Every structure is written in structure tokens, then in C-alpha cells.
Amino acid sequence: MLGMSLREAAAALRLGQIKPTELCQKCLSFIKETSFLNAYITVTEDFALKQAAEADERFIQGKPLGDLDGIPIAIKDNFSTAGIETTCASRMLKGYIAPYNATVVQKLFDQGAVFMGKTNLDEFAMGSGSTDSIFGPVKNPWSYSRSYIDKTSLSHHAAKDDSDWVITGGSSGGSACAVSAGTCYLAIGSDTGGSTRNPASHCGVVGLKPTYGLVSRHGLIPLVNSMDVPGIVTRCVDDAATVLGVLAGHDPYDSTTIQDPFQPFSLPEKVDVRNVCIGIPKEYHAPGLSAEILSLWSETADLLENAGAKVVEVSLPHTPYSIVCYHVLCTAEVASNMARFDGLEYGHRSDIDDSTEALYAATRREGFNEVVRGRILSGNYFLLKRNYEKYFVKAQKVRRLIADDFVKVFNSGVHVLLTPTTLGDAAPYLEFIQEDNRTRSAQEDVFTQCANMAGLPAVTVPAALSSRGLPLGLQFIGRAFCEQQLLTIAKWFEKQIDFSPLQFNRDSENGNIVQQYSKSASSV
């Protein structure tokens, strides 16, 4: 039951094969069994059971609220949830309880979704490994899979080193982990430069970043206002389309959302790609791209071409400048957004209050980790009067050129772009943290941040297992507000691949998940 897709679970609920409370209890039990993964910051057990009991009554009366009624979900802990702690995985907001629900959260609740808890992340979503949370790093569930154990010749009698488990990617690593492990059927993440797609790729699930403005950001604690988008993590493309239909549309609380009504859509069961033109950006042959990803990318292009699609090489000439441009704009907006955390209104407040300036400085020093403080410093540097035109304004101009590159390609007749999602499979934790956050983020975001810069929809789909038995994903980038076309092509690819979901390595005697990595890497 826990391995089903969202739509399969919804069908089982409608047919009475299982009750919402039974499904909720199964998920809660599995959350406890897999707690070593550290996917959740807060588990809302009582709240979930109450919601599930209410769903039971609706199903008895034959009046379910929608496709998500009774479906267990999880929310990244940078979305506001009324009455439930929202921490952003930071000391700055530890203990903070928002007075309202984010719009996406409220829309899910209005559909009857059952809220299992808040998922772990890099502090304030600044990272690409889910390793910089005050609640400890998130462990990739594939570290405990049969495929990884077999490929790396590990057994539960050996390899008791933390370096043997691999990262989830980030910053929405908890959300991707929760869906991949089977503790919920849907998780909401945020995506500023790839923060939903990156961990989805590393965890072998589907990660959708909608077009900027299609889904409300109200209640998402901002990182970069001009790029932040709520992301959707599911087990299959059809599920992502279902959830998008619930979340998309205008929100009076978010002036950047579209004004026109959004029409939910279902993807066709049979997809024909013979009239589709797929673009392969030549600039995405980036340094560090693994041979496995390169081969997979090429094989997928051939697969599409053999099915009748037109596959053409295209150029996005300003791509080489994109990651640097992204860094300037990202840190500048971070510096602005983080200014609100001053110890006066909400969040952490230092005891050092000899003066207002001393309070500000101590609060931010105690509340933010080094990564956040470093990005604030970088952003403030770019925003200095003497640097503003040279860095920030120039980066804005380059961003426009990057967006124009995509417009030209799509206007040439290309429907969707096919690219890698990441440079390779997930790195071991101890290897990942050897390099600083900034370097790692630049490496991990190289293929994903362009879609955020241009405001385009993009989805990553699991495609294969690496030689180490870990998931590899490929990314499809579509035209603005053309999610239906994008997801239809992604579904076709998904059906051709038929990717096998995670199978935990279990003890043959007691059936428990084998945890060969016995030492805890978490510290709060």
C-alpha cells in the first residue's frame, strides 16, 4: 500500500479497500521505522489522525472533498502552518509558530489531504545537500536499498562509517526522502535554483518546478522572491499533474500569481511524440558531467528520435554566465529578505541587548549558521552603492539575456528541452561536506537554476540507476505556462523507462530495514 502512487492510493480509498485512518496509521508507523533518515523535523501525528478521522466520515457519506482526500502528505518546513512550528531548520526560527497557513498548504487541506509533518531542509533553503540543518542532515533512503548495498558490496556486518550513506540533495531533501521512502504520497518543496528537482533526482522520484507565478508563494518564507516557486514531489508524473491542478491559480495574497483561471488537466493514457520537437542544449555539456549521465542523456535523445520525435541541437549562448549571475542575484535578495530577522518582531532574540546595534548583531550571529551569514555578506557587498551597477544591475541584464535565449529556442519550434538534472549520482555525506556550501551549490545547480532565472516550468524524472545502484534523473524544461505539454512528454519518457522504485534492504529474519550506518551524524 505504501508503495502505491497517489492516484492508486486515492482509488483504493474511493473503493473502500482501505480507510483514511488506516492509511494514516500505516504512514505514521513507517515514519517511525525510518526516523533514522531524518526526513521530518516535526511529525504531526495527532493532527494527522484527526484529519484522517474526518476523511473517514466523508467517505462513509460518499462526499470526498477531492482527489487528495485522505491522502498522507508532507510539507517542507519553510512553509507557514497555523499552530504548527515552522523553523526553516534554523535556530533563528526554532519555536516559531505562524498564525496562518501558506496558500498551498490551505489548498491541500481544503482537498482533505492528511498532514503527516514538516520536512527537513538546508537552513533557510540555502544549500544543495540537505546537510546544513540544525536538526542534522537528511539521509538518502537509497543508501539503505538493496541496489546500493549490492553494488557497493556492503553488508550489515561491515561499513559502519557515516561516509557510506549518501546525501539526498537539497534543499528540499526531507521532502524527496519522505516520498521516496514511502512515508507519504506527496511532499511540497520549494525551488529557487533547483531545490526540488535536485533532491528528487537523487532520491529517484518526480520533482516539478511550475512556471513562476502559476502557484502562490504566500506563506513560503522567502529566499529569492523573483525565483522562489513551490515545488511538487511525487512518485510519478501523473501524480504531479494531479497536485498541480489543486495548487495552481491566482491568489489575492500573491500579486505575482497569474490573473487568468487555471484549468486542471489529466494526462492522456497513450502519448504520441511523433509531432514533438525536442531541443538538446549544447551548452549543457558542462565540466564534471559524469559519463553515466552523458550516456543516459544521449540514449534518451535516441529513444525519442526512434519514437518519431524530432530531436535537434539548440544553443542557449548565455548559459556559461548563468550560475555566476544566479549567485549575484540570489545573494542580493537573500541579504534583503534576511534583514527582517532582527530579534525585534519574531524569531530568536539574543540576551545581549546593550544597544539596538548589539542586539541586531548578536541575534543574527546566534540565529544564523555560517552559510546564511556568508550569503548575506555576499549580497550586501553586491548591493553596496559602489558595486550596485557593476554587479547587481549587470546581473539583471544578463538574466534577461538568459531568458531571451529560451524564448528564441522555443519560438524556433522546439516544444521541450531535454537536459541532465545533476552532474552525477548522490555523493557520500563525508565527501560532500569536504567542499564549502557555495562550491557545492554551484555544482549541483548548474543544470537547474536556468529555469528559475527564466521563470520556466521544469520537471525531473527518474531514468536509471548508476553503477553504484543510485538514482539518476533527467530534466525536461518547457515553455512558460505549458505544464500540460511538458508533463505529457515527461510521462511518455517515464512509461518507456519504467523505473523501479526503492526497495529497502531488510533483515531476512525480522524484516527490519538494515541500518549498517550505526553512528548518528545528527546534532541539534
Curated annotation (Swiss-Prot):
GO terms for molecular function: ATP binding; glutaminyl-tRNA synthase (glutamine-hydrolyzing) activity. Its EC number is 6.3.5.7. The keyword Protein biosynthesis applies. Subunit of the heterotrimeric GatCAB amidotransferase (AdT) complex, composed of A (qrsl1), B (gatb) and C (gatc) subunits. It comes from the Eukaryota. PANTHER family: GLUTAMYL-TRNA(GLN) AMIDOTRANSFERASE SUBUNIT A, MITOCHONDRIAL (PTHR11895:SF7), TRANSAMIDASE (PTHR11895). GO terms for cellular component: glutamyl-tRNA(Gln) amidotransferase complex; mitochondrion. Gene3D superfamilies: Amidase signature (AS) domain (3.90.1300.10). Keywords: ATP-binding, Ligase, Mitochondrion, Nucleotide-binding, Protein biosynthesis. The active site is at residues 76, 171, 195. Signal peptide: none annotated. This is Glutamyl-tRNA(Gln) amidotransferase subunit A, mitochondrial. The keyword Protein biosynthesis applies. It catalyses: L-glutamyl-tRNA(Gln) + L-glutamine + ATP + H2O = L-glutaminyl-tRNA(Gln) + L-glutamate + ADP + phosphate + H(+). It is found in: Mitochondrion. Its main location: mitochondrion. GO terms for biological process: glutaminyl-tRNAGln biosynthesis via transamidation; mitochondrial translation. It comes from Xenopus tropicalis (Western clawed frog).
